[in-house]
From Swiss-Prot:
GO terms for cellular component: mitochondrial inner membrane; respiratory chain complex III. The cytochrome bc1 complex contains 11 subunits: 3 respiratory subunits (MT-CYB, CYC1 and UQCRFS1), 2 core proteins (UQCRC1 and UQCRC2) and 6 low-molecular weight proteins (UQCRH/QCR6, UQCRB/QCR7, UQCRQ/QCR8, UQCR10/QCR9, UQCR11/QCR10 and a cleavage product of UQCRFS1). This cytochrome bc1 complex then forms a dimer. Binds 2 heme b groups non-covalently. It comes from Chaetodipus californicus (California pocket mouse). Keywords: Electron transport, Heme, Iron, Membrane, Metal-binding, Mitochondrion, Mitochondrion inner membrane, Respiratory chain, Transmembrane, Transmembrane helix, Transport, Ubiquinone. Disulfide bonds: none annotated. A ubiquinone binds at residue 201. This is Cytochrome b. Its cofactor is heme b. Belongs to the cytochrome b family. One of its GO terms (biological process) is mitochondrial electron transport, ubiquinol to cytochrome c.
Length: 379
């Protein structure tokens, strides 16, 4: 078997990626989220495939087809809730994965990092379009509000929005094309994830110390296959407990009402994983300015390799940067909370301060902290 694993053209690729891959001996549980994201993608594609067998992408029957899945299809309710909450699990793992990358300086692998940002954008687009499909109140109004933001683009904005809608409002054409894109994008994400892995294996994994680990490598199997498997068991147990006991906790009650273009919900808000970006969007009174801030809130991640001023790669031994990192995490929690609140005092000013702090920490304070820490090391 060993000979076949190393000689067969197909098995050889798997062997180099998951079995004989040399890995640092000291990577912690924070390195489990890559494999967990792969698990999330498999769960979402599998559950989504079964949902697509019973779903109809038509404005008249979309809402009732989801009700039919929950009531009449064998274990349809379970598949539906696994898929809906699977998106939340996906983003939770995604944000922890990105946080790990920032804390330990993994962004210094520029190609891997930039493909990761592309994966984030693709996942966000997929999740947004998936949220529109049940055709509830929040689905319809969420689609209307978010697609309408493109009208802020000078000169071509209005034409672009009507082109995406396939008409003069969010309607049947919009729903049909969103379903088509929502179905194909996860496979594009899977292919992009392969490229992400390809570039990662060119350099090898980073480690908590942020130093080269060539002198101390261990094979991926059995050490990290078992470590990843433990993570999978813990996450699956927690996830299924959540799905079976609190399936609607993260959903919006408005989405249990069919879409009605004549009745606007009092508070239009996206799912929890977009609230931080939504808060940044709303914190700027100008429409175009808000859209630019929204895009930059994610795109700013691409600047991390350029803004790295510290002599050390990881934040493990950099207390000032650590303090700023955890302040940034707290700030993101505040933005998430503000994104779910109505636009009224004191939430407006809190959101604006939190948005300024978000960009200040990333663009100004972290690079300065790196330089200060370099000075301290020389003393």
């Amino acid at each position: 078997m060993t000979i076949l694993r190393k000689s067969h053209p197909l098995l050889k690729m798997v062997n180099h990626a998951f079995i004989d891959l040399p890995a640092p001996s000291n990577i912690s549980g924070w390195w489990n989220f890559g494999s967990l994201l792969g698990l999330c993608l498999i769960i979402q594609i599998a559950s989504g495939l079964f949902l697509a067998m019973h779903y109809t992408s038509d404005t008249i029957s979309a809402f009732s087809s989801v009700a039919h899945i929950c009531r009449d299809v064998n274990y349809g309710w379970l598949i539906r809730y696994i898929h809906a909450n699977g998106a939340s699990l996906f983003f939770m793992c995604l944000y922890l994965h990105i946080g790990r990358g920032i804390y330990y300086g993994s962004y210094m692998y520029k190609e891997t990092w930039n493909i990761g940002i592309m994966l984030l954008f693709l996942t966000m687009a997929t999740a947004f379009m998936g949220y529109v499909l049940p055709w509830g109140q929040m689905s319809f109004w969420g689609a209307t509000v978010i697609t309408n933001l493109l009208s802020a683009i000078p000169y071509v904005g209005t034409n672009l929005v009507e082109w995406i809608w396939g008409g003069f409002s969010v309607d049947k054409a919009t729903l049909t094309r969103f379903f088509a894109f929502h179905f194909i994008l996860p496979f594009i994400i899977a292919a992009t994830a392969m490229v992400h892995l390809l570039f990662l294996h060119e350099t090898g994994s980073n480690n908590p110390l942020g130093i080269p680990s060539d002198s101390d490598k261990i094979p991926f199997h059995p050490y990290y296959t078992f470590k990843d498997f433990l993570g999978v068991i813990i996450i699956l147990a927690s996830f299924l407990t959540f799905v079976l006991f609190f399936p609607d906790l993260l959903g919006d009650p408005d989405n249990y009402s069919p879409a009605n273009p004549l009745n606007t919900p009092p508070h239009i808000k996206p799912e929890w994983y977009f609230l931080f970006a939504y808060a940044i969007l709303r914190s700027i009174p100008n429409k175009l300015g808000g859209v630019i801030a929204l895009v930059l809130s994610i795109l700013v991640l691409a600047l991390f390799p350029l803004l790295h001023t510290a002599n050390q790669r990881s934040m493990m031994f950099r207390p000032i940067s650590q303090f700023l990192f955890w302040t940034l995490v707290s700030d993101l929690f505040i933005l998430t909370w503000i994104g779910g609140q109505p636009v009224e005092p004191p939430f407006i000013i809190i959101g604006q301060i939190a948005s300024i702090l978000y960009f200040s920490i990333i663009l100004v304070l972290l690079p300065i902290a790196g330089l200060i820490e370099n000075k301290i090391l020389k003393w």
